[in-house]
Design a protein with these regions (language model features):
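Catalytic domains of carbohydrate-active enzymes, especially glycoside hydrolases
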Residues: 43-68, 163, 314, 390-396
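Active-site-adjacent "subsite" loops/lids of carbohydrate-active enzymes
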Residues: 106, 110-164, 173, 194-219, ...
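Carbohydrate-binding surfaces of carbohydrate-active enzymes
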Residues: 20, 104, 211-658
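N-terminal carbohydrate-binding accessory modules
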Residues: 18-52, 112, 356
């Protein structure tokens, strides 16, 4: 193992160094106020009263970095020019919030600072290829490898932690950013610190565009600073939580469910479920805080997204064991109040039923692998998202993880089936050989041998032939499946149930596919490894379903799942757009149902009411109680499953099983 690989491995190993704090023990209803400099004179009692009225119990608000909201004595740290003389706004909010049992998390942003700091210490700052700094609205971008992050920031944090009994700290825009707020690329940092460190590690110059080595370099650099910040917080305020957009060294893993006008379609209505599920199952000892961003895009921070999108994210976060959150820009005195008025009743309902929203863990027996940020490789979202959708629409309870900690050790968990898209690491072999089942749907070969690879074609516009309809009952009305994209040819081992049809003529109509030829090239293989098995679909099933939603691809997935996982953990007649999460909490099981039927193309509308949803959950449960629409359901035990009917689903329902 190389020194570079070892350092990254140690950073990943240390990612579990989190304390068991209030964020894991208490139900969280979290409001983030992204304060402007001009908000430095806000009425602290009014803000705390507004938070208490909506039953928020955590507020994340501006503390320092770009602008301090308290008097600071640290050189090169500046209070907001709008902070009234003699006023300590942050201290006032802390006092008023704590008086109402509301925790306060301070927000810092060390990614940018004033020109005066640049003039005094130009070596602390991000430098583009030609040596010029990155300037946005008069603020200069710092570098994660420079003295601002690695020295000055620690002085600022030390003062803040000594002065205030904060409940936690959060860090915005952590590390070097590749684009500014307007979306303009700024390139890679070529400051002296970065160039020297990169050359020492990789024995070459920083590239013009990011490659695998550079991504690892940035990953390692940011985690070094994250570790130092974590150590400082735990030294000075051991009861305070550490929250960041990374997994390593933190207590809470931050993410955002947000929108952007230039983001490629289709929209991703599972955003909060995706983020929270992944964080809670990748790092079970850390809290997932997916920020419910109410604004449309940076240019329109005061215009809110649809009410139903805000509500959907809220239910998804709670259903997957994460914090209920809401973000605003400025104070709660908003010009567009639609999103705020949408979440207020959800916050109040969650407070009235908070006993169900702390200490949840996934009960799923199927695992979907995401891709880790520290691998150096880039992975497309489409294959993963397509498999995520298929699992949700088939109502298969599943956990998501982007590491292999679950294979062995303290975090070991047992799964009946593991599903992977483009990331299939070598550690999966241990899981399979011990008796596990793995479904791999990707043209990328796994990091261990399943079948001999002949070659990979990057773009195949052909078909998959169904040779054995008995194996695929969902495909009884079709002999062909669309194939578009990369395809890996592997060695055949007997007759294949699915085979490749390569591209053929597509026009004019008189010549369409007149030269179509079948092959014996398998489009799916199954191999035994030790006590377990691997089923490999060597093409992009997930990506095609994500983009095109073809029933044939869904049918193939359904039939493969039935073969690999015949004893389903959950069976239901629910519509595919009813999302279901199966969770454990102490001695009871929680079944969350979320109605996604209001999502259509680029819109979110009130969901269509669902009635008489029949559910069978593996296990012997004697009682089933609905919470959103209170009621006791009749439970029958059939073949090892407990059967009951949910009479009505509007936006969300919670069923308590005992």
């Amino acid at each position: 193992m190389t020194t570079k690989s070892l350092s990254i491995l140690m950073l990943m190993v240390n990612s579990a160094a989190a304390q068991e704090g209030w964020w894991m023990k208490e139900p969280i209803r979290w409001v983030q106020t992204n304060l402007r400099q001009t908000d430095a004179g806000l009425d602290a009692a009014r803000l705390a009263g507004q938070l208490a009225d909506m039953r928020a119990n955590v507020v994340l608000m501006g503390m320092g970095g770009i602008a301090a909201y308290y008097p600071t004595a640290v050189e090169f740290h500046y209070a907001s020019p709008n902070l009234p003389a003699g006023r300590d706004m942050f201290g006032d909010v802390l006092r008023e919030a704590h008086a109402r049992q509301i925790r306060v998390v301070g927000r810092f942003d060390f990614s940018k600072t004033r020109q005066a700091v640049f003039d005094a210490h130009p070596e602390w700052f991000f430098r583009q290829t030609g040596g010029q700094p990155v300037i946005y609205n008069g603020l200069y971008s710092t570098c994660i490898n420079g003295g601002y992050y690695r020295g000055q920031a620690m002085k600022i944090l030390s003062e803040a932690l000594d002065k205030y009994a904060v409940d936690g700290l959060f860090f915005n825009m952590f590390g070097n950013q590749s684009r500014d707020y307007s979306g303009r690329p700024v390139g890679l940092c070529h400051c002296d610190s970065c160039q020297r460190k990169y050359r020492q590690l990789y024995h070459k110059d920083i590239p013009e565009t990011p490659d695998d080595d550079y991504r690892k370099f940035m990953f390692t650099s940011s985690r070094e600073v994250a570790a130092a910040i974590g150590d400082l917080i735990r030294e000075k305020r051991p009861q305070a939580g550490y929250f960041n957009y990374i997994q390593e060294y933190t207590d809470g893993i931050m993410s955002e469910s947000n929108t952007a006008v230039a983001r490629p379609l289709p929209l991703w209505p599972y955003s909060a479920s995706d983020h929270v599920n992944r964080a809670r199952n990748s790092e079970p000892g850390k809290m997932a805080i997916d920020l419910n961003m109410q604004f449309v895009d940076y240019w329109w921070r005061f215009a809110t997204v649809p009410r139903q999108e805000i509500a959907l994210r809220a239910w998804q976060s709670m259903a997957n064991g994460g914090a209920l959150t809401f973000e605003v820009n400025g104070t709660l005195d908003l010009q567009d109040r639609q999103a705020l008025e949408t979440v207020k009743p959800i916050f109040r309902w969650a407070a009235a039923h908070e006993q169900y929203y702390a200490g949840q863990s996934s009960a799923a027996r199927v695992l979907l692998l995401g891709a880790p940020s520290g691998s150096g490789r880039t992975f497309g979202e489409e294959p993963y998202r397509g498999l995520f959708r298929l699992l949700s629409e088939e109502h298969v309870p599943f956990a998501v993880a982007d590491n292999m900690d679950w294979v062995s050790g303290a975090k070991q968990r047992e799964f009946d089936l593991v599903i992977a898209a483009d990331w299939a690491p070598a550690e999966l072999r241990q899981y399979v050989e011990s008796g596990g089942k793995l479904l791999l749907a990707s043209a990328h070969a796994p990091e261990f041998e399943v079948a001999q690879v002949v070659r990979t074609e990057s773009d195949v516009k052909g078909y998959v032939r169904v040779r054995d309809h008995a194996a695929f009952p969902s495909l009884k009305d079709t002999d062909l499946l669309m194939l578009n994209g990369p395809f890996t040819e592997v060695s055949a081992d007997g007759a294949a149930a699915l085979t490749l049809i390569p591209p053929s003529l597509i026009g004019p109509p008189e010549l369409v596919h007149v030269d179509m030829k079948d092959t014996n090239t398998p489009a799916m293989v199954t191999r035994q490894l030790g006590k377990g098995s691997v089923t490999w679909i060597p093409w992009n099933l997930g990506g095609m379903y994500y983009l095109h939603s073809l029933p044939a691809h869904a049918g193939l997935f359904r039939d493969v799942m039935d073969r690999l996982n015949p004893r389903r953990q959950l069976r239901t007649n629910a519509h595919p757009l009813v999302e279901i999460a199966l969770m454990r909490q102490g001695g009871r099981t929680l079944l969350h149902l979320i109605n996604l039927s209001g999502h259509s193309q680029t819109g979110y509308f009130p969901p269509v009411q669902m009635k008489d949803i029949q559910v069978e959950v593996a296990g012997d449960f004697r009682t089933a109680t609905t919470v959103r629409k209170p009621g006791n359901l009749t439970v029958k035990t059939v073949g090892g499953h407990s059967r009951f009917t949910v009479p009505q689903l509007l936006d969300y329902e919670l069923v308590i099983l005992k």
